[in-house]
Amino acid sequence: MTLSFITRWCDELPETYTALSPTPLNKARLIWHNAELANTLSIPSSLFKNGAGVWGGETLLPGMSPLAQVYSGHQFGVWAGQLGDGRGILLGEQQLADGTTMDWHLKGAGLTPYSRMGDGRAVLRSTIRESLASEAMHYLGIPTTRALSIVSSDSPVYRETVEPGAMLMRVAPSHLRFGHFEHFYYRREPEKVRQLADFAIRHYWSHLADDEDKYRLWFSDVVARTASLIAQWQTVGFAHGVMNTDNMSLLGLTLDYGPFGFLDDYEPGFICNHSDHQGRYSFDNQPAVALWNLQRLAQTLSPFVAVDALNEALDSYQQVLLTHYGQRMRQKLGFMTEQKEDNALLNELFSLMARERSDYTRTFRMLSLTEQHSAASPLRDEFIDRAAFDDWFARYRRRLQQDEVSDIERQQLMQSVNPALVLRNWLAQRAIEAAEKGDMTELHRLHEALRNPFSDRDDDYVSRPPDWGKRLEVSCSS
């Protein structure tokens, strides 16, 4: 089957990119590919049998028109000016059978005009982390970019140490970022900001294209998508680590996995990025940061969208976020209805977990085993202050009994939203260290496990992290 690529970005937004081809690595080799995703995208298996090929930037497929995008952004709350694809190249936009499209973006593809002081490369460590994280999030049901392939090489890349160079093929319906809009707003080119908005609406919000109120409705949906995404992050204990405006997806996807982390111990102020000295991107600050980023996007639209309309959309953010968050947390607790004491029960559980540094994922998974008419709970053994837990658990059981559903029905609901497995940093690190020694077994094994996060397991993937795996420091270096 021949893959079809179109050139919408290239044709319609000529001032937003530089056309260039990838720079291949030395002795590149394909070490992993996503067969399930490839099948979904109708990619012939033969493409994965011819060496690094397109996955390593050595060849292009017919119809591809590679380019590096330019954008700007606020980093850690400070205007950083022009940024752009410093090591990534958009190879093309695949036209799928249903009429939708999928960007093929090759990360680590070499120097671009936007590399600044960088070398245009990615290392094996970071490409493995992103591949694992994006697939983990996908199977958790959270909107995200996807990983299609990893290529390793003999090319040395210099970071804190010398690491093997690598490339990641990332796919997504669009790589439109808040930073694309900021770039032209701060260059005082509002007509180009409007072109970007029209492009987005035409291709991703086409049902609004002929609406005279399209910009307000479109921005309101961007706000809603962002609020929903952040609510989902918070419910699974995911910290992004570097929520700069240039890392914010217009479509509400999780984008640019760097120093991310899933909660081990429940620590509301968890900081996963060791460069985040002020805690701007701490776990509990993510909802506020996302709103701040949306405000920056709204500012770029103010030359052609009424400020009152923008503010009305921004004002809806909190309610949308709380609605999504509340619904999912009630499901995690096994509540079939909404009762006035629900928030108090959740907050008291969080307080108990924070005091005892309870494991976030294990706590909710074990809570899924609760039988409403039994005072016994396997979760009790996870707490030191048994009296405090017993007091909370007694009130929790009384609340469960109000819903009048069977234990089996409730447990099935809870186990469908409380994962047994998340991508803890130590699991990723173990796969990385093996891969750097040439053993890809753990990389493939972990990828396979992450496809079923809600299934019970009896291996160390669902155990508490070992001592060496706690508080692993992760930086933006990639």
UniProtKB/Swiss-Prot annotation:
Keyword annotations from UniProtKB, A to Z: ATP-binding, Magnesium, Manganese, Metal-binding, Nucleotide-binding, Nucleotidyltransferase, Transferase
Superkingdom in the source lineage: Bacteria
UniProt-listed Enzyme Commission number(s): 2.7.7.-, 2.7.7.108
Cofactor section: Mg(2+); Mn(2+)
Leading EC class: transferase
UniProt: Mg(2+) binding residues: N247, D256
Pfam families to which the protein is assigned, alphabetical: SelO
Family, as annotated: Belongs to the SELO family.
Functional summary from the UniProt entry: Nucleotidyltransferase involved in the post-translational modification of proteins. It can catalyze the addition of adenosine monophosphate (AMP) or uridine monophosphate (UMP) to a protein, resulting in modifications known as AMPylation and UMPylation.
Name of the protein: Protein nucleotidyltransferase YdiU
Organism, scientific name: Escherichia coli (strain SMS-3-5 / SECEC)
